Amino acid sequence: MLKRVAIFASLPLIASCSLQPMHSELIPYYQVETAKPYEEVLTELEIAIAEHNFRITAHSRVGKVIRERGAENFPDFDTIQFCNLSLAKTMLDINPAAIGFMPCNIVTYQQAGKTLIKIHLLPENGDNPALNTFAADMNRQLKQIVDFAATP
């Protein structure tokens, strides 16, 4: 009987734990599919990145390298990292911890006959209103880059 009383008495404490908001480190993504040829998508991404005044800092052709190492039919997977130093400075002036969101990173790969383009976005719902405003503007530009590359 005492055991049951202890269990029932602890239920509000246990339930209150589940009511606590969970801190999430999840990064929102924006993804678009296209029927455009893979290499054309990569070229269009490079153009769109440059038109938005970003500079490509790295391009990793992961699928190609895996094929070169013997996996003949391995599909294409690419990552393109890019940055705009003026925007980076603005973001870091707002919050130095935002360095974790840099550089911007787009991934492309093929699946089920389509080319997928995926980019992680900056969180817009943090505690810093200035950073949220900055993130919303950046996310608009990042989506425009992806959409440009995906549009036939």
Annotate the PLM regions.
Residues L122-P152:
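C-terminal partner/receptor-binding element of secreted or periplasmic proteins
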Residues A15-S16:
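C-terminal motif of bacterial Sec signal peptides marking the signal peptidase cleavage site
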Residues M102-N128:
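Beta-strand/loop substructures that line and gate deep hydrophobic ligand-binding cavities in soluble
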Residues L19-P75:
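N-terminal secretory signal peptides
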Residues M1-A6:
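Bacterial N-terminal signal peptides that target proteins for export
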Residues E51-H52, T57-C104, L122:
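Compact, glycine-rich, soluble single-domain proteins
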